[in-house]
Amino acid sequence: MTDVSAPVFDGKAFAAQLSTAPGVYRMYAADDTLLYVGKARALRNRVGSYFNGSPKNARIMSMISQITRMDVTVTRSEAEALLLENQLIKSLSPRYNVSLRDDKTYPHVLLTREDWPRIALHRGPRAIPGRYFGPYPGVTAVRETLNLMHKLFKLRSCEDSVFRNRSRPCLQYQIGRCSAPCVELVPAPEYAESVRRAALFLEGKSDELTRELGEQMQAASEALEFEQAARLRDLISSLRSMQTRQYVDGRAADLDVLAVAMQGSQACVLLLAFRDGRNLGTRPFFPRTNGEESPEEVLAAFVSQYYIEFEPPREILLDREIPDADLLVAALSASAERKVQLKWNVRGERAGYVELASRNAQLTLATELNSRNAQHARSDALRDMLGLAEPVKRVECFDISHTLGEATVASCVVFDAAGPVRAQYRRFNISGIEPGDDYAAMRQAIDRRFRRAVEEQGVLPDVLLIDGGAGQLAQAQAALADLGVEGVLLVGVAKGVERRAGHEALVMPDGRELRPGAANPALQFIQQVRDEAHRFAITGHRGRRQKARMTSKLEDIPGIGPRRRASLLKHFGGLVGLKAAGEAEIAKVEGINDALAARIYANLHGLATPDAAE
């Protein structure tokens, strides 16, 4: 049915008043939904091509019929337009664009920037000062790299709270994987040199590092510093041994291999990564498509979106030629500030890598489709068991986690017919209730989640699972009734008498109990969702509990607000380090004077509190 209230968009008139400069255009529907983002070498020509009456496929015709307004951004070059286009696609996910969907956080190796740097696996925002190397295809590749770093350069991996409170070396020192900077068994300049060498290695400059170490070994030998020369000799030997084991092909150097497989509207792009000649493994991606894009278009969209966020290697092998390859090369090279090559139809060893990536892409897509089909079957079984007329498009589940009422956290996880939608997970820190009151915690969490949905006209689930029995279900019912939320089917998931998986009872709003049995695919789906909610709640609770225990003793000290509390914990690496410090050491922290340091020390050690003011 046509929406007669929607304004008519005159695409021809809009295009006619555009310039012929390069740029990016955006198409919007009547409700301001972003339909599509595109780039243009000449905006007037490209935008006008949508409205010139020439034949177009069904997807394009459907999109054009929904346009009520457009806007454009002029850029200095087509390469700049390409970068902007893909930044917008990645951040806004327009309905009709191929979009790289990946709700996982890419793992990196982090080398911190501090007096005694540590090396560690890192996920998430780059909030910690330091250098980030990656991304790596998976955690296994990062751990293998860290293992090499500890063996070769003996850098610390411990958290600051542990590092600052060691009185003797730990096991890592005893097994030769750390030089014990915590107790300064290694001089600061020597440790800094190890950090510099590790950075060279992580940058892919192991050949340069080996040559440099050889020169240092020769110099030490000529200076009759034979112990130092022997240490350098052993390090060179370890590096060469590692290279012999790890290098698949010395010519591979820094290289990404990309292959795409498609079946219907489902696509898989597989990344095979080499860094410094080492095979770091594979990582699959499943871009959102509309079913009418070619594999070449999907691969081109992936290349532009992925390498806008992450630094590209010098060479990227593709399993097929892609559109706008020259433009992509120019944009990626400009972004990386060095030459980046895209290659296809390669020979020799590189052809073998492409074949390997292609085969893995096909196998991974087949596995993913089987998994999604099984997930869809479980979702359909849930619909049938609950007697719903329509397919279940969205399921949410709430769970509560706490330790004897401490640090209560509620979780909300979201599933659709294809599986978890992790980007829409939410946690709620529960406050203002009697500790341990799970009913009040559940009601507060439901109220907060759905109040916002009502105020912002957000998406509601078809089925809302509550981890608990009739009591918890009643709290959820009351919260939804207070908000006037209708059309959401509530189901309580109560553990059986023996709390065994497969013996759960499903409590319905009318008081009925369903016991589907362990083999029922609908119950298996519910268990999957419930277990994910449980995991997400526990993770949040543990983090909140740890933070509360670190800061609670400081909150009771007059004159210690959030900023000073954070400074103290950061300086000493935690409450243990702070308690071990004397008044003079505490007074060295920014914002802490002698009187306040004395008060802090007294409070932490149960002494009479000085009356001195700040």
Swiss-Prot record:
Gene Ontology molecular functions: DNA binding; excinuclease ABC activity
Family the entry assigns: Belongs to the UvrC family.
Annotated GO CC locations: cytoplasm; excinuclease repair complex
Cell compartment(s), UniProt: Cytoplasm
Disulfide bonds: none
Alphabetical list of InterPro entries matching this protein: GIY-YIG_endonuc, GIY-YIG_endonuc_sf, GIY-YIG_UvrC_Cho, Hlx-hairpin-Hlx_DNA-bd_motif, RuvA_2-like, UVR_dom, UVR_dom_sf, UvrABC_protein_C
GO biological processes: nucleotide-excision repair; SOS response
Keyword presence, DNA repair: yes
PROSITE patterns attached to this UniProt entry: GIY_YIG (PS50164), UVR (PS50151), UVRC (PS50165)
Stated name of the protein: UvrABC system protein C
Keywords linked to the UniProt accession: Cytoplasm, DNA damage, DNA excision, DNA repair, Excision nuclease, SOS response
Domain GIY-YIG: 20-98
Chief location of this protein within or outside the cell: cytoplasm
Pfam family, one: UvrC_RNaseH
CDD domains: GIY-YIG_UvrC_Cho (cd10434)
